[in-house]
Amino acid sequence: MDSQQDNKKWIAVYTKPRHEKTVENELLKKGFEVYLPILKERRKWSDRKKWVEFPLFRSYIFVKTEIKNSLFVLQTMGVVNVIKFGSEIAVIQND
């Protein structure tokens, strides 16, 4: 396995409200691996019904990156912060 791939960890990123798709697209352009879990729900209005997609976790997106590159993630348009426990970036386990 590639040693560079071994250093990559999943981190959670907090976005501006309703900017999850924008952040996903911007991070993909920068070459990051991104995961944005989406739910589909049928919504009903007075005149129509429609399937609507929305994020499972509002204002959160997951990025696989080396911890040292988290600054590049933070500099992405729409990103508010990288989730941390204390002063350390929170790493999401693969299990």
Report the location of each language-model feature.
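Acidic-enriched and Gly/Ser
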Residues: 1-95
